[in-house]
Amino acid sequence: MQPIQIAIAALVVAIIIAIVVWSIVIIEYRKILRQRKIDRLIDRLIERAEDSGNESEGEISALVEMGVEMGHHAPWDIDDL
């Protein structure tokens, strides 16, 4: 192979690796943003529950829409056997 062909092949491989790495970074960043949003909603729920004595239905429904289950999550409760 000519040196120019090797350089082009290396450039193509580097571009493919960069695309894969940045795709993974974007996916992880979205997960972090989603988790922050969930954490903020849970904090608001806790704050409102302390203030009023009950929980806000609107925020619970927002958490349910995102797929977050509310309730007691004990690590020793294993129901997936």
From Swiss-Prot:
Mapped to this chain, the residue ranges on the Extracellular side of the membrane are: 1-6
Result of changing S52N: Complete loss of interaction with human BTRC, and of CD4 degradation activity
Describe how its activity is regulated: Ion channel activity is inhibited by hexamethylene amiloride in vitro.
What is the recorded post-translational modification?
A: Phosphorylated by host CK2. This phosphorylation is necessary for interaction with human BTRC and degradation of CD4.
**Swiss-Prot/TrEMBL keywords:** AIDS, Apoptosis, Host membrane, Host-virus interaction, Inhibition of host innate immune response by virus, Inhibition of host tetherin by virus, Ion channel, Ion transport, Membrane, Phosphoprotein, Transmembrane, Transmembrane helix, Transport, Viral immunoevasion
Q: Give a GO cellular-component term.
A: membrane
What InterPro entries does this protein's entry cite? Vpu (IPR008187), Vpu_cyt_dom_sf (IPR009032)
Which residue stretches are annotated as topological domain Cytoplasmic? 28-81
Q: Which residues cross the membrane?
A: 7-27
Instruction: Describe its membrane topology.
Output: Single-pass type I membrane protein
Give the principal location in a single coarse category: host cell
The record's subcellular location field reads: Host membrane
Q: Which GO terms describe its molecular function?
A: CD4 receptor binding; monoatomic cation channel activity
The GO annotation for biological process reads: receptor catabolic process; symbiont-mediated suppression of host innate immune response; symbiont-mediated suppression of host type I interferon-mediated signaling pathway; symbiont-mediated-mediated suppression of host tetherin activity; viral release from host cell
Phosphoserine: which positions carry it? S52, S56
Q: Which family does it belong to?
A: Belongs to the HIV-1 VPU protein family.
**Functional note:** Enhances virion budding by targeting host CD4 and Tetherin/BST2 to proteasome degradation. Degradation of CD4 prevents any unwanted premature interactions between viral Env and its host receptor CD4 in the endoplasmic reticulum. Degradation of antiretroviral protein Tetherin/BST2 is important for virion budding, as BST2 tethers new viral particles to the host cell membrane. Mechanistically, Vpu bridges either CD4 or BST2 to BTRC, a substrate recognition subunit of the Skp1/Cullin/F-box protein E3 ubiquitin ligase, induces their ubiquitination and subsequent proteasomal degradation.
Any remaining note in the record? The infectious clone pNL4-3 is a chimeric provirus that consists of DNA from HIV isolates NY5 (5' half) and BRU (3' half). HIV-1 lineages are divided in three main groups, M (for Major), O (for Outlier), and N (for New, or Non-M, Non-O). The vast majority of strains found worldwide belong to the group M. Group O seems to be endemic to and largely confined to Cameroon and neighboring countries in West Central Africa, where these viruses represent a small minority of HIV-1 strains. The group N is represented by a limited number of isolates from Cameroonian persons. The group M is further subdivided in 9 clades or subtypes (A to D, F to H, J and K).
Describe, as the record does, how this protein assembles with itself and its partners.
Answer: Homopentamer. Interacts with host CD4 and BRTC; these interactions induce proteasomal degradation of CD4. Interacts with host BST2; this interaction leads to the degradation of host BST2. Interacts with host FBXW11. Interacts with host AP1M1; this interaction plays a role in the mistrafficking and subsequent degradation of host BST2. Interacts with host RANBP2; this interaction allows Vpu to down-regulate host BLM sumoylation.
Know the name of this protein? Protein Vpu
